[in-house]
């Protein structure tokens, strides 16, 4: 098995072809041999019967002593006919030879048992013969006609060889044609292998499936899809690395500055405590940024959701509002939940949908002024998170949800990734997210399906 796996496809197909042809040729030869020998035996048995009946029509009463026909040279051949392959003799009822052909007939032993065909040997000879015994019309004489079995077999072999030899001669030409066809049909695969060998890892150009056999075309299409996914993943990774490096540069620089301030504060405890407080806040911001970067990276690598379940959005929103209640109270913001629909069920990943709702609520609380109200409303085909703040300028609204985008002049710290995470989770669940200014005032996010 290991040896055949190391062989090329062309060699394996050629070997299979040769094996199949050899088996077919052997079976055909065997069948042809059996059919030919049966036909030859039937033909020659018929000739022996006719010959014996001709002899029985002679006037055998004139035979008084053993006689023989005119002697002919041994094995006189006319074409492919051996004249000593056929012999006859006539015996009396008591086994006395009365007439023979002057050649092999005189060596036929008298072994009459009944009329019909029988096999036997000539005197002092090891070659098997086919004999036909026949009684004369008056029953006084025994006529025997014989033919050598080797002659029949040689005749059958000659007929079979004449039939199969052209096929045997044509076999090398068939093999040559097969090799040429295999070379032509496998040429697209060679080109495909060469294209893969010299393909750049960053290339997004699809493989050319022109001329590729239909059995291999699904493989080429699957490879093209794989290359497209790999290219998209590499683009995302590059963008993620670039964005992460850019966004982490500022917090890390701020941490370095606060560390230096703490070191330079000397014996001033107020300056040192202030610097350490700001350092702690900076570490929190950097930690939050790293967490969001890792979350977004994991979401980008997902194509299909795992561990999905049927989720009640009513329970999901209630749980999210309860979780955000204390941070909202500390910010002097009231969060209200209104259920305009019940028993709204969606299939999804529970943790991701919880993260989506939590990010929307966290964004609303972080950017709403104190004393604001955040309304969460569930409908049959959507849910809305809306605050009653000043809203967002139209020129800024078009950029909301982009990665690392933060409106200018913001006093609240953030990374600009929260709403990007929301949009990605919604996409994975077949939902759409829209951001805009509410008619009653304030900013709202609508998640619909």
Curated annotation (Swiss-Prot):
GO cellular component: plasma membrane
Disulfide-bonded cysteines: none
UniProt keyword annotations, A-Z: ATP-binding, Cell inner membrane, Cell membrane, Kinase, Membrane, Nucleotide-binding, Phosphoprotein, Transferase, Transmembrane, Transmembrane helix, Two-component regulatory system
A GO BP entry: phosphorelay signal transduction system
PTM annotation (Phosphohistidine): residues: 246
Membrane topology, Periplasmic segments: 34-161
A Pfam family annotated for this UniProt entry: HATPase_c
Chain ranges of the HAMP domain: 183-235
Topology term for the membrane: Multi-pass membrane protein
Enzyme Commission number(s) of this protein: 2.7.13.3
Keyword hit for Phosphoprotein: yes
NCBIfam families, per the entry: PRK10337.1 (NF007664)
Name the UniProt record assigns to this protein: Sensor protein QseC
Natural source organism: Salmonella typhimurium (strain LT2 / SGSC1412 / ATCC 700720)
């Amino acid at each position: 098995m290991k040896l055949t796996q190391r062989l090329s496809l062309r060699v394996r197909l050629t070997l299979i072809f040769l094996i199949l042809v050899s088996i077919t040729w052997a079976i055909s030869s065997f069948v042809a041999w059996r059919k030919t020998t049966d036909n030859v035996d039937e033909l020659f048995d018929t000739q022996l019967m006719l010959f014996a009946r001709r002899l029985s029509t002679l006037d055998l009463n004139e035979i008084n002593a053993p006689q023989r026909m005119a002697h002919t040279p041994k094995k006189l051949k006319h074409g492919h006919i051996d004249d000593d392959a056929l012999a006859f003799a006539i015996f009396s009822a008591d086994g006395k030879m009365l007439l023979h052909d002057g050649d092999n007939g005189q060596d036929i032993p008298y072994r009459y048992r009944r009329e019909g065909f029988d096999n036997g040997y000539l005197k002092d000879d090891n070659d098997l013969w086919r004999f036909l015994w026949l009684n004369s019309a008056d029953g006084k004489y025994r006529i025997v006609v014989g033919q050598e079995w080797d002659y029949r077999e040689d005749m059958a072999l000659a007929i079979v060889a004449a039939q199969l030899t052209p096929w045997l001669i044509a076999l090398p030409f068939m093999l040559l044609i097969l090799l040429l066809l295999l070379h032509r049909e496998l040429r697209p695969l060679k080109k495909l292998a060469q294209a893969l060998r010299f393909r750049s890892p960053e290339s997004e150009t699809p493989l050319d499936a022109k001329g590729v056999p239909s059995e291999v075309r699904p493989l080429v299409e699957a490879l093209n899809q794989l290359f497209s996914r790999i290219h998209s993943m590499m683009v995302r990774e590059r963008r993620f690395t670039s964005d992460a490096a850019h966004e982490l540069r500022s917090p890390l620089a701020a941490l370095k500055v606060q560390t230096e301030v703490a070191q330079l504060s000397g014996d001033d405890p107020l300056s040192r405590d202030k610097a350490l407080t700001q350092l702690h806040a900076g570490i929190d911001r950097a930690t939050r940024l790293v967490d969001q970067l890792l979350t977004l990276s994991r979401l980008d690598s997902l194509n299909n959701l795992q561990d999905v379940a049927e989720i009640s959005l009513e329970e999901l929103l209630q749980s999210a509002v309860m979780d955000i209640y204390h941070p909202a109270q500390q910010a002097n913001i009231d969060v209200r939940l209104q259920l305009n629909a019940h028993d709204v069920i969606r299939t999804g990943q529970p943790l991701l949908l919880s993260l989506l709702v939590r990010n929307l609520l966290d964004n609303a609380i972080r950017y709403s002024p104190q004393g604001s109200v955040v309304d969460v409303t569930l409908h049959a085909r959507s849910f809305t998170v809306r605050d009653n703040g000043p809203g967002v300028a139209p020129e800024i609204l078009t950029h909301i949800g982009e990665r690392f985008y933060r409106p200018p002049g913001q006093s609240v710290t953030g990374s600009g990734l929260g709403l990007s995470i929301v949009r990605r989770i919604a996409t994975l669940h077949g939902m759409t997210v829209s951001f805009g200014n509410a008619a009653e005032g304030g900013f709202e996010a609508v998640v619909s399906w």
